[in-house]
Protein backbone atom coordinates (compact mmCIF):
# COMPACT_ATOMS: atom_id res chain seq x y z
CA UNK A 1 0.00 0.00 0.00
CA UNK A 2 1.15 3.54 -0.72
CA UNK A 3 2.83 5.02 2.39
CA UNK A 4 0.77 8.19 2.04
CA UNK A 5 -2.52 6.28 2.10
CA UNK A 6 -1.28 3.98 4.85
CA UNK A 7 -0.36 7.05 6.85
CA UNK A 8 -3.76 8.60 6.23
CA UNK A 9 -5.52 5.42 7.38
CA UNK A 10 -3.36 5.22 10.50
CA UNK A 11 -3.99 8.90 11.20
CA UNK A 12 -7.76 8.54 10.83
CA UNK A 13 -7.79 5.43 13.03
CA UNK A 14 -6.18 7.32 15.90
CA UNK A 15 -2.49 6.67 15.34
CA UNK A 16 -1.85 10.32 14.53
CA UNK A 17 1.90 10.46 15.15
CA UNK A 18 2.59 7.28 13.19
CA UNK A 19 0.26 8.35 10.41
CA UNK A 20 1.89 11.76 10.07
CA UNK A 21 5.32 10.11 10.04
CA UNK A 22 4.25 7.75 7.22
CA UNK A 23 2.84 10.63 5.19
CA UNK A 24 5.88 12.80 5.76
CA UNK A 25 8.19 9.95 4.71
CA UNK A 26 6.22 9.56 1.48
CA UNK A 27 6.25 13.30 0.74
CA UNK A 28 10.01 13.49 1.40
CA UNK A 29 10.65 10.58 -0.97
CA UNK A 30 8.46 12.17 -3.64
CA UNK A 31 10.45 15.40 -3.32
CA UNK A 32 13.81 13.58 -3.52
CA UNK A 33 12.83 11.63 -6.61
CA UNK A 34 11.03 14.56 -8.24
CA UNK A 35 7.91 12.41 -8.43
CA UNK A 36 5.21 14.78 -9.58
CA UNK A 37 2.19 12.66 -10.53
CA UNK A 38 -0.63 13.85 -8.22
CA UNK A 39 1.93 15.50 -5.96
CA UNK A 40 -0.48 18.37 -5.25
CA UNK A 41 -3.09 15.88 -4.02
CA UNK A 42 -0.54 14.15 -1.80
CA UNK A 43 0.55 17.46 -0.29
CA UNK A 44 -3.06 18.39 0.41
CA UNK A 45 -3.80 15.06 2.12
CA UNK A 46 -0.77 15.65 4.33
CA UNK A 47 -1.77 19.27 4.99
CA UNK A 48 -5.30 18.21 5.99
CA UNK A 49 -3.86 15.75 8.52
CA UNK A 50 -1.47 18.38 9.88
CA UNK A 51 -4.36 20.81 10.25
CA UNK A 52 -6.49 18.21 12.05
CA UNK A 53 -3.61 17.52 14.43
CA UNK A 54 -3.31 21.21 15.32
CA UNK A 55 -0.19 22.01 13.29
CA UNK A 56 -1.72 24.97 11.45
CA UNK A 57 1.49 26.75 10.50
CA UNK A 58 3.11 23.61 9.17
CA UNK A 59 -0.09 22.74 7.30
CA UNK A 60 -0.09 26.23 5.79
CA UNK A 61 3.48 25.72 4.54
CA UNK A 62 2.51 22.42 2.89
CA UNK A 63 -0.53 24.07 1.27
CA UNK A 64 1.76 26.84 -0.03
CA UNK A 65 3.93 24.17 -1.64
CA UNK A 66 0.83 22.60 -3.21
CA UNK A 67 -0.30 25.98 -4.54
CA UNK A 68 3.14 26.55 -6.04
CA UNK A 69 3.04 23.10 -7.65
CA UNK A 70 -0.41 23.85 -9.09
CA UNK A 71 0.81 27.14 -10.53
CA UNK A 72 3.98 25.70 -12.05
CA UNK A 73 2.42 22.49 -13.38
CA UNK A 74 -0.78 24.08 -14.66
CA UNK A 75 -2.75 21.19 -13.18
CA UNK A 76 -5.89 22.70 -11.69
CA UNK A 77 -7.61 19.52 -10.49
CA UNK A 78 -7.01 20.23 -6.79
CA UNK A 79 -6.83 24.01 -6.95
CA UNK A 80 -10.15 24.53 -5.17
CA UNK A 81 -9.17 22.16 -2.37
CA UNK A 82 -5.83 23.95 -2.00
CA UNK A 83 -7.66 27.27 -1.63
CA UNK A 84 -10.07 25.74 0.89
CA UNK A 85 -7.23 24.35 2.98
CA UNK A 86 -5.33 27.66 2.84
CA UNK A 87 -8.43 29.39 4.18
CA UNK A 88 -8.89 26.72 6.84
CA UNK A 89 -5.27 27.11 7.95
CA UNK A 90 -5.62 30.87 8.23
CA UNK A 91 -8.89 30.53 10.15
CA UNK A 92 -7.27 28.08 12.56
CA UNK A 93 -4.40 30.51 13.18
CA UNK A 94 -6.68 33.14 14.68
CA UNK A 95 -8.49 36.42 14.44
CA UNK A 96 -5.89 38.46 12.54
CA UNK A 97 -6.22 36.21 9.49
CA UNK A 98 -10.02 35.85 9.35
CA UNK A 99 -10.67 38.26 6.47
CA UNK A 100 -7.94 36.62 4.42
CA UNK A 101 -9.26 33.19 5.37
CA UNK A 102 -12.70 34.22 4.11
CA UNK A 103 -11.21 35.38 0.79
CA UNK A 104 -9.42 32.03 0.28
CA UNK A 105 -12.59 30.09 1.12
CA UNK A 106 -14.73 32.23 -1.20
CA UNK A 107 -12.12 31.65 -3.91
CA UNK A 108 -12.37 27.88 -3.30
CA UNK A 109 -16.14 28.05 -3.78
CA UNK A 110 -15.77 30.06 -7.01
CA UNK A 111 -13.07 27.79 -8.46
CA UNK A 112 -14.96 24.60 -7.71
CA UNK A 113 -18.17 26.01 -9.18
CA UNK A 114 -16.33 27.14 -12.30
CA UNK A 115 -14.86 23.65 -12.64
CA UNK A 116 -18.24 22.00 -12.07
CA UNK A 117 -16.83 20.16 -9.05
CA UNK A 118 -19.97 20.08 -6.94
CA UNK A 119 -18.58 17.97 -4.04
CA UNK A 120 -15.59 20.32 -3.70
CA UNK A 121 -17.92 23.32 -3.90
CA UNK A 122 -19.99 21.83 -1.07
CA UNK A 123 -16.91 21.26 1.07
CA UNK A 124 -15.66 24.82 0.45
CA UNK A 125 -19.08 26.36 1.06
CA UNK A 126 -19.37 24.48 4.35
CA UNK A 127 -15.98 25.79 5.46
CA UNK A 128 -16.97 29.33 4.45
CA UNK A 129 -20.33 29.09 6.24
CA UNK A 130 -18.65 27.83 9.43
CA UNK A 131 -16.14 30.67 9.33
CA UNK A 132 -18.88 33.25 8.87
CA UNK A 133 -20.90 31.69 11.70
CA UNK A 134 -17.87 31.76 13.96
CA UNK A 135 -17.57 35.47 13.19
CA UNK A 136 -21.27 36.03 14.02
CA UNK A 137 -22.19 36.78 10.40
CA UNK A 138 -25.33 34.65 10.24
CA UNK A 139 -27.11 36.72 7.61
CA UNK A 140 -24.79 35.69 4.78
CA UNK A 141 -23.32 32.56 6.31
CA UNK A 142 -25.41 30.04 4.45
CA UNK A 143 -26.01 31.77 1.11
CA UNK A 144 -23.40 29.88 -0.92
CA UNK A 145 -24.06 26.66 0.96
CA UNK A 146 -27.84 26.81 0.32
CA UNK A 147 -27.25 27.38 -3.39
CA UNK A 148 -24.77 24.52 -3.71
CA UNK A 149 -26.74 22.14 -1.50
CA UNK A 150 -29.79 22.84 -3.68
CA UNK A 151 -27.83 21.80 -6.78
CA UNK A 152 -27.58 18.19 -5.62
CA UNK A 153 -30.16 15.77 -6.97
CA UNK A 154 -28.96 12.63 -5.20
CA UNK A 155 -26.67 11.41 -2.46
CA UNK A 156 -28.61 12.98 0.40
CA UNK A 157 -27.71 10.06 2.67
CA UNK A 158 -23.98 10.70 2.35
CA UNK A 159 -22.16 12.18 5.34
CA UNK A 160 -21.19 15.33 3.41
CA UNK A 161 -24.75 16.21 2.44
CA UNK A 162 -26.12 15.24 5.85
CA UNK A 163 -23.54 17.52 7.50
CA UNK A 164 -24.42 20.33 5.10
CA UNK A 165 -28.10 19.99 5.96
CA UNK A 166 -27.35 20.10 9.69
CA UNK A 167 -25.16 23.18 9.23
CA UNK A 168 -27.89 24.94 7.23
CA UNK A 169 -30.38 24.15 10.01
CA UNK A 170 -27.96 25.50 12.64
CA UNK A 171 -27.49 28.69 10.65
CA UNK A 172 -31.24 29.14 10.25
CA UNK A 173 -31.85 28.76 13.99
CA UNK A 174 -28.85 30.78 15.23
CA UNK A 175 -29.34 34.04 17.04
CA UNK A 176 -27.59 37.10 15.59
CA UNK A 177 -24.18 37.69 17.14
CA UNK A 178 -23.86 34.13 18.42
CA UNK A 179 -21.98 31.21 16.93
CA UNK A 180 -23.90 28.63 14.93
Which functions belong to the PLM regions below?
Residues 1-180:
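Helix-coil-helix junctions within alpha-helical repeat/solenoid scaffolds
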Amino acid sequence: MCPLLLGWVRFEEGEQAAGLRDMETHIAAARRHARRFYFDYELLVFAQALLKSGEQERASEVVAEALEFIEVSGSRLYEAEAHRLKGACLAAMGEKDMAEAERWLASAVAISQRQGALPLALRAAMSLARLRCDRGQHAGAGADLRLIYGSFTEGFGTPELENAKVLLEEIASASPGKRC
